């Protein structure tokens, strides 16, 4: 096992050394990677659940580059900019990074992708992950990006439609679903309209409910009550589903109101939602590192198609189902990757 680990490490170092040696010889400097994060400086771990912004974080991306043989200060330079949770700072921070003339910029979440894309049309940008609608607008063509942006998507419309279908399977009497969306997130603000055709086939009426952050929740809850909703759907938005305190507050209120919650965030079922159909965001961030590796090796953005997740984690919460008087169908239990007792 030790010999195998040594060989894997050696291969990674050799693989990365050739392009970087050529780079240094040609330019007289180390390649520079700009990293734009909506989170905090202290938020550099790569665990499945972290304290503040529980997206994949730059730590998972850096972990991916280390696995490819990159070492900050030795054969690459990382320039970080952190918004410290204030996503309105992202445009200014993206402009700062551009002024440093990095060879490639990495970012994640919809806010980071939009800010970086607006700051430069020349420097290659790798996003991973971010919402599908946002990446489609920035890259313009998934198969062969025609702009300077590529990367991996966070979720897809089809994934959320399937999650809505799972909600109906688990709670068959569901007829009115409140879709909690952040109007400040361009990837999700139109989601009630995007999901409406699929909802109609299931006999479900959707109502969009807006909330930008925890401060907006009391008003959002009042609107959900007024809508007559008998279930709730949470998109995988960093400010709502992606922040532990806000997510748990939403789920506690939903349980008190006896509303089953479905979400495309893999963390929701674990915290008391009924069902989640989510992605492994840490793996997607590590995948984004391979894009940066290829760009530093000479690849053009147009040669790097945008990738969509190919696997999803289905989680169902049996405790929540019991509290709501629901029985999880055996076929759903058989398909589930995780059953929370």
Map each language-model feature to its residues.
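Short hydrophobic alpha-helices and adjacent helix-cap/hinge residues
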Residues: 1-341
């Amino acid at each position: 096992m030790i010999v195998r680990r040594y060989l894997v490490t050696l291969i990674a170092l050799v693989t990365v050394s050739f392009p970087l040696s050529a780079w240094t010889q040609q330019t007289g400097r180390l390649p520079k990677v700009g990293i734009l994060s909506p989170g905090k400086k202290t938020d550099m771990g790569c665990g499945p659940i972290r304290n503040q912004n529980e997206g994949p974080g730059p730590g998972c991306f850096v972990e991916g580059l280390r696995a490819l043989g990159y070492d900050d200060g030795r054969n690459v330079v990382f320039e970080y900019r952190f918004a410290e949770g204030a996503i309105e700072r992202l445009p200014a921070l993206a402009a700062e990074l551009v002024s440093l003339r990095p060879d490639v910029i990495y970012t994640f979440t919809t806010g980071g992708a939009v800010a970086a894309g607006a700051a430069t049309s020349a420097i290659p940008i790798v996003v991973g992950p971010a919402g599908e609608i946002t990446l489609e607008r920035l890259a313009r063509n998934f198969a062969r990006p025609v702009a300077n942006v590529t990367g991996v998507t966070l979720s897809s419309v089809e994934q959320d439609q399937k999650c809505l279908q799972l909600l109906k399977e688990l709670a068959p009497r569901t007829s009115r679903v409140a879709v909690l969306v952040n109007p400040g997130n361009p990837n999700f603000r139109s989601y009630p309209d995007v999901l409406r055709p699929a909802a109609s086939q299931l006999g479900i009426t959707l109502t969009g409910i807006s909330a930008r952050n925890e401060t907006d929740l009391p008003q959002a809850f009042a609107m959900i009550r007024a809508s007559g909703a008998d279930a709730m759907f949470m998109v995988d938005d960093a400010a709502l589903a992606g922040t532990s305190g806000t997510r748990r507050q939403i789920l506690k209120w939903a349980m008190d109101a006896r509303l089953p919650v479905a979400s495309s965030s893999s963390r929701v079922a674990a915290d008391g939602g009924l069902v989640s159909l989510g992605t492994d965001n840490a793996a997607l961030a590590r995948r984004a590192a391979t894009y940066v590796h290829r760009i530093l090796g000479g690849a053009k953005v147009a040669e790097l198609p945008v990738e969509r997740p190919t696997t999803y984690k289905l989680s169902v919460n049996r405790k929540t189902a019991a509290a709501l008087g629901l029985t999880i169908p055996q076929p759903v239990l058989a398909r589930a990757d995780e059953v929370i007792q």
